[in-house]
A protein has these predicted regions:
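Rossmann-like dinucleotide-binding domain for NAD(H)/NADP(H)
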Residues: 2, 6, 11-104
Length: 104
C-alpha cells in the first residue's frame, strides 16, 4: 500500500468506505505523516473498534484524517432519503403497485 500512496499526487485524498482490510493502516499513517498524500477519510477499518495502539490514532494533524466508523451514511440528507423511500414503498403497497421488483 505504501508504494501506491507514494505514486499518488501529494494533493490526493484517499477515501475508503468499502472494506477495511484492503488498506494497510500502517502504510496509510506513514503516507499521511510524510505528506505523500493530503488526507484520508475512512468509514471502515481493518479492526473495529480501532485498537488504541493503531498508528492512525497517532496522527496529530486532524486535517489529515477523518474517521467515521460506519456513520458516513448518517447525514440528515441520507436519513431523509431513507424515510422518503420507505414512505413511497408503503404508499405503493397500499395502492397495490409493485415497487422495486427483482427478478432472477
Amino acid at each position: 500500500n505504501y508504494d501506491a500512496f507514494c505514486r499518488m499526487k501529494e494533493s490526493a485524498y484517499f477515501i475508503n468506505v468499502g472494506r477495511g482490510p484492503i488498506v494497510v493502516e500502517e502504510d496509510l499513517a506513514k503516507a499521511l505523516e510524510e505528506g505523500q498524500i493530503r488526507a484520508a477519510g475512512l468509514d471502515v477499518m481493518r479492526i473495529e473498534p480501532l485498537p488504541i495502539d493503531s498508528p492512525l490514532l497517532k496522527i496529530q494533524d486532524s486535517s489529515k484524517l477523518i474517521i467515521t466508523p460506519h456513520t458516513a451514511w448518517a447525514t440528515s440528507e441520507a436519513r431523509q432519503r431513507c424515510v422518503d423511500v420507505v414512505t413511497e414503498n408503503i404508499k405503493a403497497f397500499l395502492r397495490g403497485e409493485d415497487k422495486n421488483i427483482v427478478r432472477g
